[in-house]
Amino acid sequence: TVFALINLSPDEYGNPEHIAQALSKYHQVESIDICTGDWEIVAKIKTKDQESYYEFVKTVLPRRGIIKIKSLTSLKQVKSEFIVW
């Protein structure tokens, strides 16, 4: 599992849903969130291996409106729970 932290260009900053919707169409994207702080979008991406993630980064993530990507690789998931309020 990789968490991709995404910065948007100034022309997309006011409408992050546009990029989020475009990325959400890929089967590798498990979840996508619009955030506050230093990164506008956080995408949870699952691929079968590191090479597949590399191809995803090379082909999908370089798109108009995205100016910076930082990848955080999960080494071990300690807890995952679905909570309904």
Indicate residue ranges for each PLM-predicted region:
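A compositional/biophysical signature of low hydrophobicity enriched in polar/charged and small residues
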Residues: 1-85
